[in-house]
Amino acid sequence: MSPLDANLSTADAGARDIDVFRVDADDGSGREYRLASYFQPIFSLAHRRPVAYEALIRGTDREGRVYLPAELLAQAPAGVARMQLDRQCRALHVRSFRRLRDEVSWLFLNVDPHIAVQGHRFGSFAQMLEESGLSPHRVAVELIEKIGRAHV
C-alpha cells in the first residue's frame, strides 16, 4: 500500500488531520464544519508515477452532509471568515501532505483569486511552509476559475 493509500483510506480516518471551521451567526448560534484534506494524484506519463498531488478540501457538518469546495466556501461570509477558511484549508493541506512523507512530489493548491490578489496575505503562507519543512519550490498554486466574473 502506498503512503497515499494509507493516508486516504476510510479505515485510517482516525489518523487523518481534521480541522473544525466555525461560522457564527448574528443570533449567537453557529455552524461547524469538519475539514479534511483529500489528494488527487497527478501522474506523469514520462515518469510513470505520480509527480504531484492536488489538495482538495471536504467539509462535513454535524448532520453528516458533505460539502464540496465551492459549497463550503459559500458557507463562509465574504471577508475575514472566508480568508480564515482559505488559510485554514491551506494549513490543513500542508500538514496532511507532509504526513505522506513524500519528499519529491509537488503539492498543488487551489486558491480563490480574491485572496491571491491580496499578496500580503501570502507572507504568512510562506512562513507556514517554512515552519512545516515543505519547500516552496514544491508547491504550485492554481487560481480557481470564477464563473460570471469579468475581471478574473
What are these regions (language model features)?
Residues 61, 75-80, 111-115:
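Conserved protein-kinase N-lobe ATP-binding Lys motif
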Residues 7, 41, 45-49, 65, ...:
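A generic structural micro-environment signature
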Residues 83-149:
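Catalytic core of bacterial c-di-GMP phosphodiesterases, primarily the EAL and HD-GYP domains
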Residues 3-74:
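Active-site core of bacterial EAL-family cyclic-dinucleotide phosphodiesterase domains
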